[in-house]
Amino acid sequence: MKADKPEQQVVISGVGQSDIGRRLNRDPLELTLDACLAAIEDAGLTTADIDGISTYPGTTAQPPGFTGAGAIDVFDALRLELGWWSGGIERPGQLGAVVDGAMAVAFGLAKHVLCFRSVFEGSAQGAGGRAAVMPGGDGRKNVPRASGFMEWVLPYGAPSASSWIAMMAQRHFYEFGTTSEQLGQIAVNARKNAALNPKAIYTDPMSLDDYLNSRVITTPLHLFDCDVPCDGGTAMIVSHVDTIPDLRKPPIRVEALGTALRGRPSWDQWDDLTTMAMRDASAQLWSRTDMKPSEVQLAEMYDGFSFITMCWLEAMGFCAKGESGPFVEGGERIATQGGQLPLNTHGGQLSAGRLHGFGFLHEACVQLWGEAGDRQVPGNPEVGVAAAGGGPMAGVLLLTTSR
């Protein structure tokens, strides 16, 4: 394996997660701190050891509930003494915060960086659902003038990513013969895995017929193709390899990473509507390691909408371009027990809740440490990927317990 990349000076030493719920109605900073303190303890560290902090998206103006706390909030609440910190939304996807932390560690700006993401979208939306927190959600009055990308979608009644992703999925259906029955396997697999996750939002059994009979949101996407807003926080500690003797348990090494910002900063103006920025992020990742897709034993990949996961499967080389439909058909290849590539083993955002990217990295680490309980992938997996992002931005990490 190549050993000359900065990310290979980095390990994940601990992870933590708060309570997760559809609507917890708790102080979002409290949820954030629960996750951060759990991650610090998991690594065998104390707050005095943390000398860096990184988060996405910080406290930037976003729909209510989109962010639970910023870097300064956590810095102050935990009384940290930092040599480096970062927080913001203009990154290659949600995991850009972890990539930033990894680079800070690799280049000597910090030894232990606390990376976190928290949301309280479920409580913020309340009974009004997503429309309650979207610009112009009342549809009649107090609608601000659209600007930027929204100028081109809001007048046509398409302010939601479901509309943009549906357009891409429709093109994939047309070009490659992908079917709703195939797409539905992403959601059915997620629900099956969520049933074994005590923190998952939705755990009731769901058949493919249940999926197909659910209401259509934007053709071809059904209700269960869309992730579930929730409340919760997730955190992880990124540490330098030189600190391994000080850690509580064997660390997870970052073998390679990939990031990308491609095309126009929108979701609808692409050279190829059947793919997204994960095509380029994945190519970058594989160029930074001698490992191959066939060596990956589990994949935790973004499912804000189920079609995004299919794009990740193709981009990462787990199947050929246009072949994600046949790859997931029947669900056997992506099953946690006995599957060729166990996929979204915690239930993903479709059933476990929209922790907005960080939940995938948390689950990959839990699995590689063998701490996933009833949903544990058998055979002591040593290599996994965690990926987040869609549209023009994407980030992915290749993780291993040995090098």
Each model region followed by its residue ranges:
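Short acidic, glycine/serine/threonine-rich loops at helix termini
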Residues: L24-R26, A124-R130, A195-K199, P265-W267, ...
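Beta-strand segments within the central parallel beta-sheet cores of soluble alpha/beta enzyme folds
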Residues: T47-P57, W84-I89, V113-S118, Q182-N189, ...
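Condensing-enzyme catalytic core mediating Claisen C-C bond formation in acyl metabolism
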Residues: M1-L29, A38, Q185, V216-D280, ...
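Short glycine/threonine-rich loop-to-helix capping motif typified by GTGT followed
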Residues: A61-A69, W267-W270, D303-P326, M393-L398
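Extended C-terminal subregions enriched in glycine
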Residues: D272-R279, A283-S306, M310, A315-F318, ...
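Conserved active-site "lid/cap" helical segment
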Residues: M1-G93, D100, A104, M168, ...
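Conserved catalytic cysteine-centered active-site region
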Residues: D4-Q8, T60-G126, A131-W164, Y202-C226, ...
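Active-site-proximal alpha-helical scaffold in enzymes
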Residues: I89-V119, S162-L196, M236-D242, A352-A372
